[in-house]
């Protein structure tokens, strides 16, 4: 275990909410910097755009608890809760920044407890993203992390060491996501314009998404839908693409990967390359699309335009099966607007039950929307701000029951906020 220490800048206390530290309002290239806006901050007109203002809600949804500062002093780009743990198990999350992945527990009484810190052997590594799974044989928690060097590390948290490394992407990896049901399947999106699907149990690359009609620039964000049979991706080319996994060919490859053994086979695994997405559009955003997640059959995505857009591929009445690869039309359902977030690689958080979204900005503020899946336009928004939170908020994560919200910042700080009402979401 690394000897890294974290500086606790503020111990949790029982002071009144009205103290001055907390306020609530209701209302590609290799030189590209993750702290610069890629274009003018002026928002452009979207095709089919609907103007929508979130409804203000009386009272902030979350209350400040504590924050710590990691001693590497560098940007923390990623944060992820281990939502695979049970309701009565500890609330654990990991951060990704510098060449380290740091694991914390959120005690029920408040505060943050440092559990582990993994330091990559390469001091030049910068982790951008991390994601949780577990060993199917031992049930030990596993943390996958990747970043600048383009190498995926799979870390055994209990042993605090990398047990597997995956090399295939030619450049940096911007995001990792595990399959929601088959937790040995890992998805990675890279600066090399490609997306890869891995089986970390048998150590093979099942599929590569990209090529002829793939992304034309860095892949910045990826996500599985809740059934795990579709992928959405977004990138610097301003495009959003859908890729289907429910075809006979893909299902066969996934099944084959479960039993494949490199030691027993004289041939490498027959990786499939998918050159053509099942849907693609550039009509939603006019800038880098740096975060995308599924919201039921809808998609949530954001760019450097001060709005998260909720949209659906094709017409509102169309099913996915009715979409054609040549069709780029889409329907915008709602927009969730915010202020002062015009740089790229700032990612929103969505709780596992898809009821709360949160996004930070360049001033250290966090916007929280409470969602109604049957009426996305009816979302209620509140703003969280602590006067000591002044750096760009890079990513937000929720605990399994959304009782804890955690975010990470460019000044190496990690912030914990607790839901005001005891009832879980």
From Swiss-Prot:
Residues 11-20 have a biased composition (Acidic residues). One of its GO terms (biological process) is regulation of transcription by RNA polymerase II. Residues 43-56 have a biased composition (Basic residues). Residues 30-42 have a biased composition (Low complexity). The keyword DNA-binding does not apply. Residues 1-64 are annotated as: Disordered. It holds the Pfam family WD40. Coiled coil: none annotated. It comes from Drosophila virilis (Fruit fly). This is Polycomb protein esc. The keyword Transcription applies. PROSITE patterns: WD_REPEATS_1, WD_REPEATS_2, WD_REPEATS_REGION. GO terms for cellular component: chromatin; ESC/E(Z) complex; nucleus; polytene chromosome. The gene is esc. Component of the Esc/E(z) complex, composed of Esc, E(z), Su(z)12, HDAC1/Rpd3, Caf1 and probably Pho. This complex is distinct from the PRC1 complex, which contains many other PcG proteins like Pc, Ph, Psc, Su(z)2. The two complexes however cooperate and interact together during the first 3 hours of development to establish PcG silencing. Transmembrane segments: none annotated. Belongs to the WD repeat ESC family.
